[in-house]
Amino acid sequence: MTDGTCETPSTTPNFQTELAAQLADLVPEAIADGKVDVEKLKELLESDIVDSTERFGLFWPGKKRALRAAQEPTTATLRPDFENSKDWETTKNVFIEGDNLEVLKILQKHYHAKIKLIYIDPPYNTGKDFIYPDNYREGLQTYLEYTGQVDADGKAKSTSARNTLDNPHYHSAWLNMMYPRLKLARNLLKNDGVIFISIDDNEVANLRRVLDEVFGESNFIENYIWESNFRPDNSSRIERENAQHVLCYARNKSLLTGLVGAQKVTQGLPSLTKSSMKLSTLTFEPDWVEFQLPDGSYSAGERSSGYTLETDVTVLEGRATSSFSLTGRVIWSQQYLEQQVFDGTRIVIKGDGFVPYSRKLATSTLAPTTLLPRDQVGDVLAGNAEIRGLFGDPVFTHPKPTTLLRYLINSVTSDDPDAIVLDFFAGSASTAHAVLALNALDGGNRRFVVVQLPEPTPDDSIAASKGYKTIAELARKRIDLAGAAISQLDTGDGVDNGFRSYRLADTNFSEWRMSSDVEEDALQQHLLSLRDSATDDATADELLTEILLKQGYSLTEDVSAAEMGGLDLRLVRDRDGDVAVLAYLNEQTKPTLEQLRALVDEPPTRIIVLEDAFQGDDELKTNLAQLAKSKGVELWTA
């Protein structure tokens, strides 16, 4: 901060620097000349230090480099993709196309400790699946070349690779991909947040040990078993694999109130019948009653139990197809019956005597069982059926069913209907679909943030034949189709089925990224490019998105264009509708002090002005800073 002006950071947080600052606060005696004195720190922690020669843990080639990949700040940003968004102005859901390592770094500022649940279904390292680039130093540059945003000087480079079984670093390559992403993901979880990771036998042992290190062994919750195929292959006489793992860890297990797998029901089924009661009639809606009768039609008339069925009843899969009435010596009135049903009680009819019993749901719940209930979570064939139902063709292979994802999401968010759910290996977008479906079921307002690399669809795939060029494009379409289908449901009215779409991109602002041995001509050209703080082709919305992200705002802020004092502005409102930010992002036109005074008089919480908009007029900048300070307004430049 200089002269009351705050400067927007050019990169994401530097975790090494932040950790050192935290150590300085905790143990100032371990800081010498502004640096951490490791020997002094060891001396202070002597009784708690593990002998490194006998330490237990998971080690592999490249681990230190992978850790540095997580700690290295990035200048990357996200650019709004209005064309591929749905309900941009109102939605709170986010779809991001890009390399998830870079994206996770970008999300650190605002979404730190804000995510309730993370679910990921990463590559299983089977020797056939896609592996993210093992390139840490130039991750963003490689990504930009891969997606065609910059050229590679004629050299064809690809981010994708196959981690084949003959690779001598087969397991370490996969671990190097996962480790930095998990480190960054943990930062985003709320203190009572939970992560679920689907995996098969190829890497479950290694993944478990990595998660023990990243999250702590004490925060392990369960290794859930999902029966992924109800009809396994019969071709092998040695193995018939039909299950996968879902590893679950908490950020801080001691803060969890519990996970919800099922509601605990009271034992027994009290009858609604009492012989001393007068005859009365009750009417039952179809979803109030569970029949333990064979499917079929049951005629109206008096039953041997003493009850009279007033209307014909058709039972299908344990439910009546329409409402019906019973007359008998019941202890409940119609009003009391309706209140009990509203409170969660269900009626059970066990035989053709049509005697009604009550089943009350207790307030307590049961945690999920290790073996996930097949009748609630479905298998991969259910996932295939969902894709066919939306697209008409199997454009994704082996997608996770939304029933599985709904079960997992509900287990953590049943008491937090406004939770944010993150999936940074979005794939077929089952997680986003599941969030929308669960909101429709229980009236929740959960939001999703999903990230997917623009991995090309195989040339010989059905998806490619249908014109879908990337998995990211397919995923967006799946969310769109799922949202449209859910909006047609009786319970789908009011569900936020839109999403804001963003793409990973290089910064919109000039940056220093030249090597020390650069040729003189190239250096001069780069210095000339630094004269402007922003690139000429960046739009105001692109500039504002990057600035807001690096200042800690979300990807779903209420942003609009506005004119004030003759200046074209971008305006950001808070939840109450008040002006939080006014941004002037035109470096070509220098504003006058009177025009800037109009901004301060609004007054917003914060004013953002491009540095080059002052065009070197330090007096104008200083006067604006003094005006802002007098009104309690923060002045930021970029």
Where are these regions (language model features)?
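Conserved S-adenosyl-L-methionine
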Residues: 3-4, 60, 100, 134-144, ...
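DnaQ-like (DEDDh/DEDDy) 3′-5′ exonuclease domain used for proofreading
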Residues: 1-119, 124-180, 610-614, 631, ...
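Active-site-adjacent "gating/activation" loops or surface patches in catalytic cores
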Residues: 140-155, 159, 362-403
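Conserved proline-anchored active-site loop of SAM-dependent methyltransferases
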Residues: 114-131, 211, 421-435, 548
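Signature of N6-adenine DNA methyltransferases within the class I
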Residues: 190-192, 201-262
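PRPP-dependent phosphoribosyltransferase catalytic core
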Residues: 437-638
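Active-site-adjacent helix-turn-beta-strand microarchitecture at beta-sheet edges
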Residues: 229-233, 242-245, 252-388
